């Protein structure tokens, strides 16, 4: 199915691009989420009429993400978790735990934005973690996993 992108989507294209995607991806995700419209003549004309408005909105969203990236870059977030004497955790530190620690530090974050390429953290130590605030704004933070003291 051919669609018009209403915002930048990583791995797919930029605002205003006409791309071909699988029908289910368009019908079940992109169109209901307001990220795309079918590429019909009427929708293309409507998009061209609203292009400046949509570009301004996307620029505002990117500026907000870049501002949050500036606050977040280089920050160290500490997460306390029960651990054994050998430094292995009784459980793991997930992206939800890291997002909660970032929010506790006073910066807005969602667990879906926290990228853990090697899966959940399972040992005490310091880890480099990426927080994808936007496709063009990715902050790198340090997560310090410490043994919880009771």
UniProtKB/Swiss-Prot annotation:
Q: Does the keyword Ribonucleoprotein apply?
A: yes
Note the superkingdom of the native organism.
Bacteria
The entry lists its GO molecular-function terms as: rRNA binding; structural constituent of ribosome
Q: Which GO terms describe its cellular component?
A: ribonucleoprotein complex; ribosome
For this UniProt record, the keywords arranged alphabetically read as follows: Ribonucleoprotein, Ribosomal protein, RNA-binding, rRNA-binding
Is-annotated flag, keyword RNA-binding?
A: yes
Cross-referenced Pfam families, in alphabetical order?
Ribosomal_L9_C, Ribosomal_L9_N
SUPFAM superfamilies in the cross-refs: L9 N-domain-like, Ribosomal protein L9 C-domain
Q: Name one GO biological process term.
A: translation
Q: Which HAMAP family match?
A: Ribosomal_bL9
The free-text function statement in the UniProt record for this protein reads:
Binds to the 23S rRNA.
Assigned protein family: Belongs to the bacterial ribosomal protein bL9 family.
| Protein name as catalogued | Large ribosomal subunit protein bL9
Q: Which organism is it from?
A: Neisseria meningitidis serogroup C (strain 053442)
